[in-house]
Amino acid sequence: MPSIPNLSQDFYRFIWDGRLLISGINPYVFTPEQLANGLLKTTELTSLEAISNAKILIQGMGSLNASHYSNYPPINQLCFALAALFAKTSVLGSVIVLRIIIIGADLGILYFGKKLLERLNLPAKNIFWYFLNPFIIIELTGNLHFEGVMLFFVIWSLYLLDKKRWVLAAILLGVSVSVKLLPLLFLPLFYKYLAPDGLFKKGFWKMKKFYWVTLATIVFTFAP
């Protein structure tokens, strides 16, 4: 738990974005290099000294990352902000908060994944192929990649969809997109769950509503 990732430097950008957010700065508007060069001058942020460990974070993320705008969706940014709120001055503290979030998501995957497998009459023990996978432990939990958080919302959405609670399932799918954009590719695959007995017309309209709820959720999360 209390260890700095050594196979990825992305976490420096996560912490940077979070500390920008709690300073009232939109992480999508300025690159770290622009702020380092003094592009932004406000009463709230007149120098990099206003952001704790700013020089360490910029150096740690590397010049390639520091020269680009943030591309992390808003729910991801919310996680970064939480890390900044609970560990305003400590890089290791922020890492621990982010890791707790990811571990919590993995436990959620274990819970809803097991329930979903049981509903599908598949061996519930198969969920441990994910939960105990060394790659998952190293890359997600160890190196703080948020695909696990995204997958938690996807699995939860699939579980609710199997229970015919498609509105809440659509909302959760929208939230998953606001963690990582990858679930957008899955949208066409939801048709089989929304078209009972292959009834195209009924399935089409339900799928259309499902997509609209998902899109509305995405827009809502991006609005702030």
What are these regions (language model features)?
Residues 82, 93-120, 128, 151, ...:
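Transmembrane-helix motifs of polytopic, lipid-linked glycan transferases
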Residues 124-137:
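Transmembrane and membrane-interface helices of multi-pass
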Residues 1-99:
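Intramembrane catalytic core of multi-pass membrane enzymes that act on lipidic substrates
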Residues 65-67, 71, 196, 206-224:
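Membrane-lumen/periplasm interface segments of specific transmembrane helices
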Residues 141-147:
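Short acidic/glycine- and proline-prone juxtamembrane loop motifs at membrane-interface regions
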Residues 104-107, 131, 148-159, 169, ...:
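Alpha-helical transmembrane segments of multi-pass membrane proteins
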Residues 80, 84, 110-114, 118, ...:
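Hydrophobic transmembrane alpha-helices
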Residues 137-140, 156-160, 166-190:
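Membrane-interface alpha helices of multi-pass inner-membrane proteins
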